[in-house]
């Protein structure tokens, strides 16, 4: 199983465990190689199991974190939004939009974890 497949399964594992998203991302290996996660690879993983995309979309519609990313569907278009700076992109394809959101969302969580780890080392 590659990194994109492991990341794609995070919401499902989260729902059936008592582990945090940060802990699950660490278990996937993402924190050691965040650059290895690409939109194309995530989109392929979602094509293999489209139900995972639905879990991510549900999670993304719940996100209103300062600095984080969210996703919503309006009139058949998906808006991926940064709550840090208002940047956004709009996609029509559901799986591609979801993949774009996932890469940005886990990137944000990964950066928060790295900042926390650096602060603890001081």
Region spans (language model):
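Negatively charged, low-complexity tracts enriched in Asp/Glu with abundant Ser/Thr
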Residues: 1-61
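Short N-terminal micro-motifs specific to bacterial/archaeal maturation
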Residues: 33, 88-89
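Conserved aromatic
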Residues: 36, 91-92
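Amphipathic alpha-helical interaction surfaces
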Residues: 48, 52, 73-77, 103, ...
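Short aromatic-glycine-(Arg/Gly/Cys) micro-motifs in beta-strand/loop hairpins
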Residues: 59-87
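A short, charged, amphipathic alpha-helix used as a generic interaction element across diverse proteins
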Residues: 92-105
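Intrinsically disordered, low-complexity charged/polar segments
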Residues: 110-122
């Amino acid at each position: 199983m590659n990194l994109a497949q492991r990341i794609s399964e995070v919401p499902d594992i989260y729902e059936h465990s008592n582990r945090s998203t940060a802990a699950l991302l660490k278990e996937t290996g993402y924190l050691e190689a965040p650059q290895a996660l690409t939109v194309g690879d995530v989109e392929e993983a979602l094509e293999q199991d489209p139900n995972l995309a639905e879990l991510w979309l549900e999670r993304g519609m719940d996100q209103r974190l300062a600095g984080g990313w969210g996703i919503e569907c309006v009139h058949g278009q998906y808006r991926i939004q940064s709550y840090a700076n208002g940047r956004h992109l709009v996609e029509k394809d559901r799986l591609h939009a979801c993949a774009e959101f996932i890469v940005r969302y886990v990137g944000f969580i990964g950066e928060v974890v790295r900042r926390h780890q650096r602060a603890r080392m001081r």
